[in-house]
Amino acid sequence: MASKDEILAGLAEIVNEETGLETEAVQLEKSFTEDLDIDSISMMTIVVNAEEKFDVTIPDEEVKNLKTVEDAVNFIDNAQA
């Protein structure tokens, strides 16, 4: 099971691969859409890659609730438990 720091680092790598954003730009308080400028198609790719990386399921109806990086980290952390 990954720690929250490991989840954040893993998400940063996934966002970097999908968008080209520097991993340092992916911080807990950042909004996926407003701060990181991630569109819905890229977000779905990020979600699928996160599901594979962390061996969790993120239901489609939950994706809209993942507004910030911290939301995603917390969801993945809870889903691993």
UniProtKB/Swiss-Prot annotation:
InterPro entries: ACP, ACP-like_sf, PP-bd_ACP. Pfam families: PP-binding (PF00550). Residues 2-80 form the Carrier domain. Keywords: Cytoplasm, Fatty acid biosynthesis, Fatty acid metabolism, Lipid biosynthesis, Lipid metabolism, Phosphopantetheine, Phosphoprotein. GO terms for cellular component: cytosol; membrane. Belongs to the acyl carrier protein (ACP) family. The modification O-(pantetheine 4'-phosphoryl)serine is found at residue 40. 4'-phosphopantetheine is transferred from CoA to a specific serine of apo-ACP by AcpS. This modification is essential for activity because fatty acids are bound in thioester linkage to the sulfhydryl of the prosthetic group. The keyword Metal-binding does not apply. Its main location: cytoplasm. This is Acyl carrier protein. GO terms for molecular function: acyl binding; acyl carrier activity.
